[in-house]
Amino acid sequence: MQREPPKRKQEKKVEKGLFDATSFGKDLLAGGVAAAVSKTTVAPIERVKLLLQVQASSKQISPEAQYKGIVDCLVRIPREQGFLSYWRGNLANVIRYFPTQALNFAFKDKYKQLFMSGVNKEKQFWRWFLANLASGGAAGATSLCVVYPLDFARTRLGADIGKGPEERQFKGLGDCIMKIAKSDGIVGLYQGFGVSVQGIIVYRASYFGAYDTVKGLLPKPKETHFLVSFFIAQVVTTCSGILSYPFDTVRRRMMMQSGEAERQYKGTLDCFMKIYQQEGIGAFFRGAFSNILRGTGGALVLVLYDKIKDLLNIDIGGSSSGD
């Protein structure tokens, strides 16, 4: 009987450790702010990458008018659509990216608590490493289920090359979602979702898992110099982006079909096969170099996230710093 109070107190502490609303909210804020800042910075590169990926499936871009590469795309966008068109779809992208990245980071830490409970890094290194991979992949897949319609709309808005309102396919985020939902139903907003889940797990598993693992091996992760953290994050985002890029290309091609009377691809597998047969393996990586440049923004997100969490004094037992 005398040991009852301490036991209840311990159970209460464990329960709080599994979900702390305050730290969870701060985690969302830290990840969201970092994501919004970096995404706005690399928006022009983001749009170039997107156009290079989907131009072969776009009804607005004829074969002879397709962009020849990154430089050609960068030069023609302001000339044909206006300078501000570099940021076309950026507002939708920020709206999408804020909850996406914030949920990724927040859930990742919660998944780490579940996957890594009782795991000793020194004695069970590979189990610890796999737990990092699993937490990153699970976080990405979970958040994708919530924000996929926004990602879909952002893709369609970014791929819209009309110069004036009368030439544009969609007037904005709301118009895009309403038109697709009206023509194809809610299912139309989830076109390419299956391959997206596959790609996001591959990307997030390496993105979060490798970053946490490398930082966790440093003597004092909390005291790591900003440039060292940025270099680690840059390598991680570059490798993760290249590894998952074919999945990203296919999912965006599938997104371009919603609302169209004629479908170019019957499904994900058919899309993979036709791209390979008709355009070659290089088509899967079209715009990949711009994606590497864009990855600088992703690396900045990881580093800013750690710094913002430090400023907010967040300590939830499993941060991106690899504590």
Curated annotation (Swiss-Prot):
Coiled coil: none
Catalysed conversion reaction: ADP(in) + ATP(out) = ADP(out) + ATP(in); dATP(out) + ADP(in) = dATP(in) + ADP(out); dADP(in) + ADP(out) = dADP(out) + ADP(in); H(+)(in) = H(+)(out)
Transmembrane segments: 24-53, 91-115, 126-146, 195-215, 227-247, 288-305
Stretches of the chain found on the membrane's Mitochondrial matrix side: 54-90, 147-194, 248-287
Record localization: Mitochondrion inner membrane; Membrane; Cell projection, Cilium, Flagellum membrane
Keyword set includes Cell membrane: yes
Residues spanned by motif Nucleotide carrier signature motif: 251-256
Residue span of region Important for transport activity: 251-256
All ranges on the Mitochondrial intermembrane side of the membrane: 1-23, 116-125, 216-226, 306-323
Keywords: Antiport, Cell membrane, Cell projection, Cilium, Differentiation, Flagellum, Membrane, Mitochondrion, Mitochondrion inner membrane, Repeat, Spermatogenesis, Transmembrane, Transmembrane helix, Transport
Binding site for ADP: R96, K108, R251
Matching PROSITE patterns: SOLCAR (PS50920)
Summary of activators and inhibitors of this protein: The matrix-open state (m-state) is inhibited by the membrane-permeable bongkrekic acid (BKA). The cytoplasmic-open state (c-state) is inhibited by the membrane-impermeable toxic inhibitor carboxyatractyloside (CATR). Proton transporter activity is inhibited by ADP:ATP antiporter activity.
Solcar repeats: 22-114, 127-217, 224-311
One BP term from GO: male meiosis I
GO cellular component terms, A-Z: membrane; mitochondrial inner membrane; mitochondrial permeability transition pore complex; motile cilium; plasma membrane
A GO molecular-function descriptor: ATP:ADP antiporter activity
InterPro entries xref list: ADT_euk_type (IPR002113), Mit_carrier (IPR002067), Mitochondrial_sb/sol_carrier (IPR018108), Mt_carrier_dom_sf (IPR023395)
Membrane disposition: Multi-pass membrane protein
UniProt xrefs under PANTHER family: ADP,ATP CARRIER PROTEIN 1-RELATED-RELATED, ADP_ATP TRANSLOCASE 4
Subunit field text: Monomer.
Functional description taken from the UniProt entry: ADP:ATP antiporter that mediates import of ADP into the mitochondrial matrix for ATP synthesis, and export of ATP out to fuel the cell. Cycles between the cytoplasmic-open state (c-state) and the matrix-open state (m-state): operates by the alternating access mechanism with a single substrate-binding site intermittently exposed to either the cytosolic (c-state) or matrix (m-state) side of the inner mitochondrial membrane. Specifically required during spermatogenesis, probably to mediate ADP:ATP exchange in spermatocytes.
The protein's name in its UniProt record: ADP/ATP translocase 4
Organism: Bos taurus
